[in-house]
Amino acid sequence: MKLPIYLDYSATTPVDPRVAQKMSECLLVDGNFGNPASRSHVFGWKAEEAVENARRQVADLVNADPREIVWTSGATESDNLAIKGAAHFYATKGKHLITTKIEHKAVLDTMRQLEREGFEVTYLEPTTDGIVTPAMIEAALREDTILVSVIHVNNEIGTINDIAAIGELTRSKGILLHVDAAQSTGKVDIDLSKLKVDLMSFSAHKTYGPKGIGALYVSRKPRVRIEATMHGGGHERGMRSGTLATHQIVGMGEAFRVAKEDMAAENVRIKALSDRFYKQVENLEELYINGSMTARVPHNLNLSFNYVEGESLIMALKDLAVSSGSACTSASLEPSYVLRALGRNDELAHSSIRFTFGRFTTEEQVDYAAQKVCEAVNKLRVLSPLWDMYKDGVDISKIEWAAH
């Protein structure tokens, strides 16, 4: 077994060999290297054909019309384009937007920017399980609400929001719904012919495709209009200018094709791995699962080990690639804002580790990881005076520490 072991599939995934093969065919002089916008020769036509084939493959996974798929540089750009694009286009109808406190930073920071431009944003608090309900959204609606943005599968805790029910509500009120689905492709069924979703963001690198490419679903029926945030040659029907990266687009298409083919079997396998891992660590004292046990993807186990500092646990697990918080924010020493929104105290938020399993995770790796986690937690607790106090029956939350 090779070390270190990668258990951070929610941060990024390796490119599937089938995807890499297809991408490599679009780079060299003997390959399909043309500019898809070159209309005057066969190199351009071939590249355009490959791009449109990939567009169909992405649309097929989510049961959309290929004409509703707009290429972007990733889910961050898709979130920006969807939220800013819709807010600016429909600003004359209203200036109120609704989102949740547990969105990805790409949504939260986009909302913050719109607040600086004069929009008003309501940030909803989830349940302690990490779920946002239609009732919460309904209670926050106003006459001037134009857009609701809700994450589908949470990147930190893996919980799944009921997008179908939320879509019924927003559509009945004539309000646009944007969904960040970066973490859900290949994990959860998405049927955009049934879901009442207006805008949906996708990423390739969370689904065994390359980094630097994503897509935005923009509904045609009912027709949704967005203002471009990137200006230039008018590519992608004017919504997103810039020469299309054929090799990355082809990679995303193939990744989504494979996801559609393998999803059912892969979910069963990963659920078995996740359960196997949890069974081996669940007897640790003061262990907490963050997020709903039922409405979550099996790929994600976010655990808090009380009386152990998450950062020191990560250092102790030097042969495991895991994370505390999300990859985008875990460089800061602030406790995870997602866990704080769930009502976790600072200590539990700081002691959290996200284990995420994927296509290339094996039983052997999971067993090794579980063993190392148990050893490290027990070892660190032996060193912890707080653990001693807890074992002696002291209620640590009642202690007033002297300030230096």
From Swiss-Prot:
Class of enzymatic activity (EC top level): transferase
Give the pathway listed in the UniProt entry for this protein. Cofactor biosynthesis; iron-sulfur cluster biosynthesis
Alphabetical list of Pfam families matching this protein: Aminotran_5
A single GO cellular-component term from the record reads: L-cysteine desulfurase complex
Q: Where is the active site?
A: 328
Instruction: Tell me the Gene Ontology biological-process terms attached to this UniProt entry.
Output: [2Fe-2S] cluster assembly
Catalysed reactions, semicolon-separated: (sulfur carrier)-H + L-cysteine = (sulfur carrier)-SH + L-alanine
Q: Where is the signal peptide?
A: none
Listed cofactors: pyridoxal 5'-phosphate
Family stated for the protein in its record: Belongs to the class-V pyridoxal-phosphate-dependent aminotransferase family. NifS/IscS subfamily.
Name of the protein described by the UniProt record: Cysteine desulfurase IscS
